[in-house]
Amino acid sequence: MKRTPFLVTCVVVPSLIGGGLYLEHRRRAAADVPIPVADGRIDVELDQAPPQKRTGAPISLTASDGSGLKLVSIRAEAQVEGPLAFTELHLVFENPESRVREGTFTIDLPASAEVSRFAMKIGSTWQEGEFVEKQAARVAYEDFLHRKQDPALLEQGPGNTFSARVFPIPPRGRKELILTYSEILPASAAYRLPLQGLPEIGSLNVRVHTPRGQARTHELVRKNFSPADDYVIADKGVVEGLSAADLRVVTVRPTAGAGAAEEPIGPTVVLVDTSASRSAGFAEQAEMVAQTLENMGDVPVHVIAFDQTSAPIYTGSAKGFRAGGLEKLRDRKPLGASSLEAGLAAVEGIDKGFGTKRLLLVTDGVVTYGESDGRKLASKLEALRSRGLERADIIAAGGIREKERLDALVAGPLPKAGILVDAAEGGKRIAKRLSKPVLANAEIDVAGAIWVYPKKAIGLQPGDPLVVYAQLPKNVSGTKVTVGTQTFEPKLAEAPMELVERAWAKAKIADLAAHSEDAADAKAQAIELSKRYRVLSPYTSLLVLESDADYERIVARAQAAFKV
């Protein structure tokens, strides 16, 4: 079957607002938003050793003819509170041509990001986006576009990619956008603002406010600057969780099994995603695969590349892959559609004499062809038990990832649980982790909680951070978290309700997607949560129109048509 080239667009964003402002109202000008500044100001330089080099710009606005508009200014404000960070990004793009243009704004956010605001400046006024069911929003956008008015539409794409259709971009003028989001920073994870890969920026101004107990503001100001790396702040304090009324977001580190013996790695099938969604950073991905296999030593491996089809790349000892298979993998090139179903089907074709015990899947989890439902893909993986498969591990590659889908594959359809590990950890560390046992589906409980997410620990190894969300009865103080046989009482700090509430809503939407038996009901509930708590979901968009009357007329009509 001929491999069809697919064009995939992908971009990045990072940053946010400080202090007590966590919930914005429509029609509020950005100039009116107060940004509190903590006492004690220090300068922090760019990170000199990011874990993984990025190819391509993290933020872009591309015109309909494919040409990029110049990013002339970035102003970023971030507030870090324990395991949560809140970021506001103010971006200014410039149209060098003497004609009005329509463009696509794209950005790749952290995997846990919850978008809460998207605004576009029209004239001297900031027009705020409203959360609308996705199809209804598209109908409204097209209607206003044809009327030569000024709409914008922000949607969540594959994984953690967000894109916005923007019109108009004035001739020889500027288009200003604001985007805000919250994200989870587990345990010792640093706050990272993606800048690496951006072209020269006329003005860059970044401020990151760290926890209130330390009251510090980290600042970076540059003119005519081309970032070589991301901006990273590790100064997070000792808070392990946040509370707001009856809601909790906490981080714990289970250590059960830390002294257990290493688990031998048996014959392993290595599935490497070579679809078009992996085009950015494909060379780095191939090198990471080679490094991982080198560190697996004499383990027999069968390496297969897949997109919407599959092709054998190498069979032999893991340590021999660099000499015997790396060049062939590079020559495969990332061109096709993304089909995890095709990859799993390829495992069935391997001779039983190989004695397959392990599966190592290198992918971003993005699916553009074939089965995409995580639970159905897990069932296909479970069917491979009859061929002797015992454990599946996943190396999550690239900045755009479908984490929920990948979690479903490592969650336990096989006799032994596997891990979901970031490709940025590097081949040596990944290979070592593959030989370590996994805390298999340990039950998670929060004493007295009405609701807990996740309900089981997935792909967790001793010492890994685990973020737990919970809703407790009102007026309950303290939080006791149990993971398997271990109990934790994390140190909590009070946080603004709107910040914690949005994290809770995002987790609630993920819980519905993972566990609801009624897909239509889960979607309806997710849309309501998205609109009520201002959290973008796969089922909603942020639609910018010119006036309240426009929302009432166009959106109400479109929503009625789609019975939302």
Give the location of each predicted region:
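An acidic, Ser/Thr-enriched
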Residues: 108, 117-161, 165-271, 292, ...
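Short, solvent-exposed beta-strand/turn "edge" segments of beta-rich domains on protein surfaces
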Residues: 75-86, 92-96, 168-173, 459-461
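Extracytoplasmic/secreted cell-surface and envelope-processing proteins
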Residues: 187-189, 278-281, 310-315, 367-377, ...
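Von Willebrand factor
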Residues: 262-317, 341-344, 348, 355-363, ...
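N-terminal, polar/Ser/Thr-rich
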Residues: 21-82
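Asparagine-centered strand-capping/turn motif at beta-strand->loop junctions
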Residues: 93-99, 107-109
